[in-house]
């Protein structure tokens, strides 16, 4: 439990036994939040003498001479953050699958390779991550932002493809930097949106990230946006010192993929049969393909690059597809059947 504006003020840590239900966690957190709120409200009246042990402890967490106004605001700014150690370690291990590719893409785009640590904040490098506002994939693109750089429809959703999404993220970050002129604001814009960041910059100045962090009160500039760049710096620090924080951890190895660009449309089942793999294997390594393809109402589109681990096929993809014959290919996509 901590103050949402002054992150140095950590009121306490609550240990939850393994298996504690969500409802019980919420009950215990709410109970402690209410108790802390009462203490802060009491201190905000100016009380500084005859303090209880809890009042003295809470007051000692704030700088000497803290104002009643600050304490009054703090009573309404108590935030709970669940521990992330296990999730971060899992994401760190997963990052090895795509890290080299991301860094190479970012170099080509003139984006600092350190920004490859950003998915630790966004998704813990989980390609199946979905947010409550509809953001998707390791880079957590929303549909509206993603469509600027990727294909997103009922056939393909490239947000869920780590390669396409990483390339798109590099382009978005490079564009944000071209407008803001500095990386703290370009990275903040990745979360908050460029228009909101530009409003803050007009109010406080182009290079006033610290002022914006402390004092900007835009309507949608909440905790996540305000602290997004700081969270990135923290994630980068842990990423760069992973052996210290996670002794014995190992990065996942990048998969050695065989790839093939389709010259025509094809049903997922026909492609799986031709390659000698299951549709489940095909789906696991081609995450942009939507459910309409696996259900058979749409073909895998012409021009799509298909990936499979080299170990999953016993010949080159070109050879396997050439030997499958012409009957499996189609010149057109299946028509929509919406009602």
Predicted ranges, named:
Residues 53-101, 108-109, 148, 152-179, ...:
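Extracytoplasmic and endomembrane cell-envelope/extracellular-matrix remodeling and assembly machinery
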Residues 103, 107, 112-115, 126:
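Auxiliary, metal-adjacent structural segments of Zn-dependent hydrolase domains
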Residues 112-119, 136, 183-188:
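Alpha-helical scaffolds flanking conserved acidic
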Residues 1-72:
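Extreme N-terminal leader/anchor segments
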Residues 129-149, 206:
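Short, surface-exposed glycine/acidic/tryptophan-bearing loops
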Residues 112-113, 143, 279:
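Alpha-helix N-capping/helix-start residues
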């Amino acid at each position: 439990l901590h103050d949402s504006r002054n992150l140095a003020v950590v009121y306490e840590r609550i240990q939850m036994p393994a298996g504690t239900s969500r409802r019980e966690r919420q009950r215990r957190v709410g109970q402690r939040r209410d108790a802390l709120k009462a203490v802060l409200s009491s201190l905000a009246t100016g009380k500084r003498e005859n303090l209880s042990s809890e009042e003295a402890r809470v007051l000692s967490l704030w700088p000497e001479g803290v104002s009643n106004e600050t304490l009054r605001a703090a009573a309404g700014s108590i935030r709970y953050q669940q521990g992330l150690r296990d999730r971060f370690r899992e994401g760190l291990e997963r990052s090895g699958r795509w890290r080299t590719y991301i860094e190479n893409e970012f170099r080509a785009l003139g984006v600092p390779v350190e920004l490859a640590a950003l998915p630790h904040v966004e998704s813990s490098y989980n390609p199946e991550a979905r947010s409550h506002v509809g953001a998707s994939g390791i880079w957590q693109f929303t549909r509206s932002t993603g469509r600027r750089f990727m294909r997103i429809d009922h056939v393909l959703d490239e947000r869920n493809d780590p390669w396409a999404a990483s390339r798109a993220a590099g382009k978005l970050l490079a564009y944000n930097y071209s407008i803001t002129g500095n990386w703290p604001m370009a990275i903040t814009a990745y979360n908050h949106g460029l228009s909101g960041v530009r409003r803050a910059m007009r109010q406080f100045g182009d290079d006033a990230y610290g002022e914006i962090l402390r004092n900007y009160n835009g309507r949608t500039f909440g905790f996540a946006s305000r602290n997004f760049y700081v969270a990135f710096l923290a994630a980068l620090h842990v990423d760069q010192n992973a052996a210290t924080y996670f002794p014995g951890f190992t990065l996942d190895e990048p998969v050695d993929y065989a790839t093939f660009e389709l010259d025509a449309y094809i049903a997922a089942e026909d492609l799986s049969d031709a390659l000698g793999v299951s549709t489940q294997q095909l789906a696991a390594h081609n995450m942009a393909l939507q459910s309409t393809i696996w259900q058979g109402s749409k073909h895998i589109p012409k021009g799509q690059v298909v990936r499979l681990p080299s170990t999953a096929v016993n010949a080159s993809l070109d050879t396997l597809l050439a030997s499958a014959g012409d009957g499996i290919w189609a010149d057109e996509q299946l028509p929509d059947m919406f009602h």
